[in-house]
């Protein structure tokens, strides 16, 4: 009986000690998440904490995850201390991220800390264990020297766990979809094709490629924020990313831009700079390219800048195609104000253009006909029979 009591008491004491250790370690994980944590405050707790490397929070984060995902200014001394206590760099949380992946989402990325968090080795089965591809290139303040190190020396590439890899995107395509791509980083990525990194940096760059290029990705990924940078667009264009490139549906980068609520004429000029055919008619297909003029393809409010309209007209395309682009294919709605303004430009220049328009629009409705008549076109049986 006495022996039983002794063993029971020993068991209770052991449980209490284990609970105390767990409680202390969980407290430390919470403290590492505290924005006010400092090396001086946390050093003793880390050094005296038993089995710190074994404890994980409910999100799968170890002590390194907790600290490097903190919004504070990460202290390299704390990172070194945690590593010295055996906290794993290759531990993955419930999101599948190692501490390096968690840290790269941080707003203050430091190269020295990234170097500490990188881990790469071959196990007994000669399998490479590495976390290098966990690094997220979308960090706003990524250091250019760090980027060169990661790409050239460490061979970073899009993670196999992302849709980017499935879709075969290169680093340039991925980087331009980040919230604030920097021109100097983008330029280095574009110029880095000379390095043998084991995969293509850029895909679908040329006119013959019927798939999205980096301009398509950049414009479409910033539609919600409406935040396009002229410098980024110039950087892409100046480094052979084609403004003539068409996606799988045949759309140009400029057509992606027409869906923005606010259209900047300077960006339009960049995307039309090399004689882009914005009004091309594909054979007998009714698909027309001047989406800017067509209400169907614009967001609310639908505003039209006549200076941009003039840019479209000044291309080598015919007025007929421009006018067709104004109309909606699935309704009888027209922007008569724009039609009238466009026709005024040609009133004294070439009446044959207006005549051609009249023949094309006779079956659409008398409002369009009135606009044409008001701008100098005359009805005659001879012309109507043409």
Swiss-Prot record:
Keywords: ANK repeat, Repeat. It comes from the Viruses. ANK repeats lie at residues 59-91, 95-126, 210-245, 249-280, 292-321, 349-381. PROSITE patterns: ANK_REP_REGION. This is Ankyrin repeat protein C17/B23.
């Amino acid at each position: 009986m006495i022996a039983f009591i002794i063993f029971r008491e020993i068991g209770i004491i052991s449980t209490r000690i284990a609970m105390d250790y767990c409680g202390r370690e969980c407290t430390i994980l919470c403290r590492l998440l505290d924005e006010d944590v400092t090396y001086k405050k946390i050093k003793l707790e880390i050094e005296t904490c038993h089995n710190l490397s074994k404890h994980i929070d409910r999100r799968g984060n170890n002590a390194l995850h907790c600290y490097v995902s903190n919004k504070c200014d990460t202290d390299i001394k704390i990172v070194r201390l945690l590593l010295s206590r055996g906290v794993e760099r290759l531990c993955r949380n419930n999101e599948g991220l190692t501490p390096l992946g968690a840290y790269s989402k941080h707003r203050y990325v430091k190269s020295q800390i990234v170097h500490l968090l990188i881990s790469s080795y071959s196990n007994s089965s000669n399998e490479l264990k590495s976390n290098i591809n966990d690094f997220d290139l979308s960090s706003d303040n990524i250091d250019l020297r760090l980027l060169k190190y990661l790409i050239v020396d460490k061979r970073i590439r899009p993670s196999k766990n992302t849709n980017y890899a499935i879709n075969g995107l290169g680093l340039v395509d991925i980087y331009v979809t980040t919230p604030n791509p920097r021109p100097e980083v983008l330029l280095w990525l574009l110029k880095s094709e000379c390095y043998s990194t084991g995969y293509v940096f850029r895909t679908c760059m040329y006119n013959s490629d019927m798939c999205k290029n980096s301009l398509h990705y950049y414009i479409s990924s910033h539609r919600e924020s409406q935040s396009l940078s002229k410098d980024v667009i110039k950087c892409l264009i100046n480094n052979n990313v084609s403004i003539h490139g068409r996606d799988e549906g045949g759309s140009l980068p400029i057509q992606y831009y027409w869906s923005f609520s606010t259209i900047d004429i300077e960006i339009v000029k960049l995307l039309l700079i090399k004689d882009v055919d914005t009004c091309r008619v594909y054979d007998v297909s009714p698909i027309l390219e001047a989406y800017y003029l067509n209400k169907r393809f614009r967001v609310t409010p639908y505003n039209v800048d006549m200076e941009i309209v003039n840019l479209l007209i000044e291309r080598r395309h015919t007025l007929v195609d421009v006018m067709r682009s104004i109309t909606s294919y699935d309704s009888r709605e027209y922007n008569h104000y724009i039609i009238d303004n466009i026709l005024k430009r040609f009133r004294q220049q070439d009446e044959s253009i207006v005549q051609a328009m009249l023949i094309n629009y006779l079956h659409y409705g008398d409002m369009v006909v009135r606009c044409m008549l008001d701008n100098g076109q005359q009805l005659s049986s001879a012309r109507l029979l043409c």
